[in-house]
Structure formats: structure tokens, C-alpha cells
Amino acid sequence: MSMEEKLNFQTSQDFSATILKPKSEEAIVEAIKHCYKKNIPLEINGLGSKKSIGKNFQSQKTLDLSSYSGVIKYEPEELYIKVKSGTSIKAIKEELDKKNQQLAFEPNDFGSLFDGKSNEGTIGGVLSCNFAGPRRFKVGSARDHVLGFKGVNGKGELIKSGGTVVKNVTGYDLSKILTGSFGTLSVFTEISVKVLPKADLTKTLVIENPHLKKGLEYLNIALGSSTDPSGGVFYPEYFRNQFIFNDLTTE
């Protein structure tokens, strides 16, 4: 038996299931290749934190990457971490906390906003959507923090771009193209992300104002002030009742 035949044998899956849960890169390749050959629409899912975002579509099968997770390599001194795409943001934060580091682009926690239960999703989901938090204007979007990746395109072919430092990228930067493509161009399998040290102290100032014009005026003043804020966000009053600020405390 050839090496390729052994690989196919070891990663062989039951494709009759509606939800496919690969635990290896080879299994992801096999699943996508099968769906491509059979012309089967495929939904890509991690922890389901962003399922309500975007346009709904009809899919016959779901590729669930929640079981394909784990830290591959973490180099605090080199300011990067390499993880599998199904790794939860929570797990990554716990690892970075050990060295007082962070994902500076602040992955959104939509779970906390809409039902009060934290669900930041997976790193693959965050980067597929290119979502970032209130620090975006200061540190850039999620795609600005991707150093490199491995992935699988719609035909089931492995692709790779970048590495673990910015200078690894020459020509077209596929990382920036695929980040924000909502899984339509490729499924991430491994991702190298830039990390940064945490600040010694952070403070959040909340100004409640029901008037849209006045609220935006306050925000512009704050962001342009000499205090050099690291982030900012404006919530219109008509949205406020839909959000649950379950971890907001005052002093």
C-alpha cells in the first residue's frame, strides 16, 4: 500500500452523516474533496457564535471544526502563536494570559451582547469574518494580525501562505484575501497570529447619552483627545436594550 493509500485509509470518514467532525487536517481535506466531487453545499462551523450573521443559505452538510483544536506552537518572545483553526478564543486567551499577552485586535463576543452568555467562537471563525473590537482604529483589523496560514480550498487542495513573521510574505498576501471571506474561498486549518503584551492597567469610560448627535460628538472628542484612547465604540440608544452588559462594573 502506498503512503497516499495509507493516508486515505487512516482518515476515511462516514460521509453519510449530516455533520462531519474531522479531527485532522487530512480528514478536512477528505471531507471537502468528497463534497466538491458530489456537488454538495457545505457549511463551515466552529462554535456557532456567528451563525446569525450574513445571508442564510441551504447546505446539505456541515463541516464542524470544533474537534480540530489545540495550540501548535507558542513563542512569547517572538510575539506569535500558531493554533489549529477550531481552537476557541477562550483557550487561546488562557494560554496568552500565562505570559501577560493578548490578541490586540479584540475578538468580538457576540454571545455576551445578545444572550449574556460568553461565546467568542473559534480563531478560524473570527478570522473568516475579519471581526475586531473597539481597538480596531488603533491596532488594525483581525487580518492585520495574521502572519500565515494553512488551509483547504473548495476543491479539497491544501494551500499555504506566510509564516511566523511579517517578512515571510511576498507577492499576493493570501492571508489578507482569505481573512474576511466568510469561508467561501478556503477553510483555515492552521493559523499563525501576532500577539502583543497587555497593558499594565486599562480603564473603560462609559458615557450614557440618548441623543445620537451628541453621543457621536462626545466620541469624536474622546478619540481626538490628548489622552490617546486605545479604543472606542458608540451604541445607539435604540440598540441598547438588545444588549446585555453582564460584566460591566462601575467605580
Give the predicted meaning of each segment:
Residues 13-110:
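Glycine-rich N-terminal segment of FAD-binding domains in flavoprotein oxidoreductases
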Residues 79-160:
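A generic, well-ordered mixed alpha/beta core segment in the N-terminal half of proteins
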Residues 1-9, 31:
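N-terminal basic/disordered segments at the start of proteins
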Residues 1-3, 56-64, 69, 119, ...:
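Polybasic, low-complexity association/targeting segments
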Residues 19-23, 80-84, 141, 166, ...:
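Catalytic cores of large soluble enzymes that bind and process phosphate-bearing ligands
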Residues 51-70, 84, 135-155, 187-190, ...:
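Structural signature of FAD isoalloxazine-binding scaffolds in flavoprotein oxidoreductases
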Residues 27-40, 107-118, 157-178:
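Short, hydrophobic/aliphatic alpha-helical segments
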Residues 128, 147-251:
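C-terminal substrate-binding/cap subdomain adjacent to the FAD-binding core in PCMH-type
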